[in-house]
Amino acid sequence: MARWKKFPRVTDVRPVARDAWWSTLVFSATAAGLAVAAGFVMFGAFMYYDDEGYVLISLRNFVEHGGLYRDVYTQYGPFPFVFYAALHGLGLPLTHTAGRLLTLAAWGSVALLCASLAGAATRSLVTRLAVLAAVFVYLYVLSHEPTHPGGLIVLVVAALAAFGYRWLAAERTRPWAIAAGAGIAILLLTKINVGVFAALSALAWFLLHHRDDHVRRWAPRLLLVGGVLVPLALMRPLLGTPWVRTYALAFACSAVATVGAASLAAGRRVDGRELRWGLATAGAAAAVVFAAIFARGTTPADLLEGLLLGPLRQPVSFSLRYVWPPGMPAIALASTAAFVGARWLRRRGNAGIDVAVATLRLAAIVALALALMGFPNVGPDYRVFAFALPCLWLFVWPLAGEKQNATDARTWVGLLLLGQCLHVFPVPGSQIAWGSFLALPLAAIGAWDATVWLARRFPRAGGRGWRAEGLVLRLAVAVFAGVLGWRLTQLAARYRDGTDLGLPGAEVVRVPSDYTATLQLLTLNAVAHGDMLFSLPGMFSFNLWSGLPTPTHANVTHWFSLLKPAQQEAIIRALEAHPRACVIKHREHIKFLTQRGLAPAGPLDAYLEKNFVPAFTLDDFEFCVRQGRHIEPLMLAEALTLASTPSPDPARPENTVVRMVTLLPAGGAVASLEIAAPGEPSGRPLILNSADARLEITPANLHGEPVGPTASHRWPFRLNGPAIVSIFFDRNGRPRPSRGALIVLRDYAGGELALARLRE
């Protein structure tokens, strides 16, 4: 009996012992390595739907003009605007680079908080490492939407879980109440639905652990009813769709089982004093934020519309579909039935039910590990979210003999996760990971507790412990953490294969070379040919890169479904006042929306369709100008077959010319051109230089119109302004330029001077 007692008593709460120096070193080195890998992931992608640009331009407009909700459109609360305005006042530029660095800091902080949470419960280095790596992997979606309020949301939720667990385990309910009040206020003022979900979680924990026996007796019944009604009320506008009905059922079943499990051994911990502390802190935080936006022109009516009424209309305006696993309703009902049966057996003194729950916890975490191991080929969040709901009650269930304060602290994390699982409605995108990431530390804590509990419950014959098995288990967990970390570094390798975007505020963002060329080309042509820029759907990074204004300050990605008719009419009037206005359309994104029943429509969409036509098309992007206007695009070449005319040099026959209006960085001398097939920049390129190509240059203006005579020119060539560059060569026996090909202009040393594309 003495030997198995040497297992860590993870259910005991005691002061955290200082880690050995090597443990701290290993954890710190691992965290640093994962953060570096995450940094490369963060700067190694740019998403076509460009929520990043929408958020950034809204932040800039608020900082420069004020009028949040009145003039500056946003779907989110005022806190992110006040937060970024404060940082901007301290010197932070509102750029893609700065926003990505802040999102990276939030990403890493969430991983550290979750690892700290697991460490506080288990005192295990390998568990901390596994949770650290798992959360980095699970929240990789943060790299898809830098600067988005989702980064702030997961940071606040992680802090509520981590600090709340520590304080509740240490029986410090006042700090928990203060932190909960502040955190919930921030969430309410960032994304109101997420704040409401966190508030409901805190209320549930408060009622279940109230010192008043009468409150505690009625709390489970009240919460069970609430757990069924809340999803029905939230999802009422879309309950006619099958995926939403399944969602409401799965959540209601999970809420019934989780609240029921939490009520089995809830201690008497809080009363009105903690409630007053929480409300006072929340009120103080809200007052600071409200004062800041009211001082910048927002009225109470604007705030009511933007913070509450507008979000209530969003499920009807824009929603996506989550594909549940087959048989999910049956799984949810079976899980609830299993809980009811387990509770019935527990009340009758059946000790074996705890063994079953502990064993099921271990099975669940094995399934979780397998889901995580699918990264990066398969995003783990989609599968984890679905099964987190029916499994949640297992990790809240109090095992016999557990310390009360540890159980209460774990219950707090479980209830917080339960509430956040509603975040996925009505748009199951990145919200899936944001709403379910707490499943990782909770599963780690619950599985550790189950392992130790089972080891104590079933000591080895003769007093022998489970030391060897424990070492094997630790090794397996360490290998799991290592594999996840390695896979994150493999994903980070894409940064090495990309090309710097090189656009203002996004200089070090890297994407594939042909995509870089497309984004640069569209931005350059917007500067050259426009004085105002709009896009369909909203891609406002182009405005940030080009410096061109949007028609109004009401900017959002899906403006066709979220902006009111009056706001769309204001944009039409602004475009009418600018004959040189340009519009960029992304046909692939429009097709994606149309296939999901979200096709753009409304007065502004009809106006754009009638009055703007494509000047050129590239990679499903259409660069549109006003009807009847003609422009010559910059850095978009065409390859032409020459008529049978004699070459100036009979020894060098010519049958092809590549011609484009070119604008180069000052001082750069072009020694060669490389033309590679689209999507295959590393393949065999067509190389044109002084050895086999003749050069002619015609001075031009930004509109592509000649302003001087055409003259032959020697390689290398420099340009002092726009020019029409014509390169003559013989294509026989050489790679043929293909439509949409990437063109790289290089100097003598092989350095990249500029990128261009061949017409499609």
Regions of interest found by a model, annotated:
Residues 75, 491-561, 571-576, 580-594, ...:
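Short periplasmic/luminal acceptor-recognition loop of GT-C membrane glycosyltransferases, typified by
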Residues 196-197, 380-398, 407, 411-413, ...:
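Hydrophobic/aromatic-rich transmembrane helices and adjacent perimembrane loops
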Residues 143-153:
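Short acidic/glycine- and proline-prone juxtamembrane loop motifs at membrane-interface regions
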Residues 101-123, 159:
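Transmembrane-helix motifs of polytopic, lipid-linked glycan transferases
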Residues 175-192, 198-206, 224-240, 283-290, ...:
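Membrane-interface alpha helices of multi-pass inner-membrane proteins
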Residues 114-138, 154-155, 171-178, 305:
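Transmembrane-helix signature of polytopic, membrane-embedded enzymes
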Residues 43-58, 68-86, 93-97, 298-300, ...:
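Extracytoplasmic catalytic/substrate-binding loops of multi-pass membrane glycan-assembly enzymes
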Residues 157-179, 187, 205-220, 233-234, ...:
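Membrane-interface transmembrane helices that cradle and orient dolichyl/undecaprenyl
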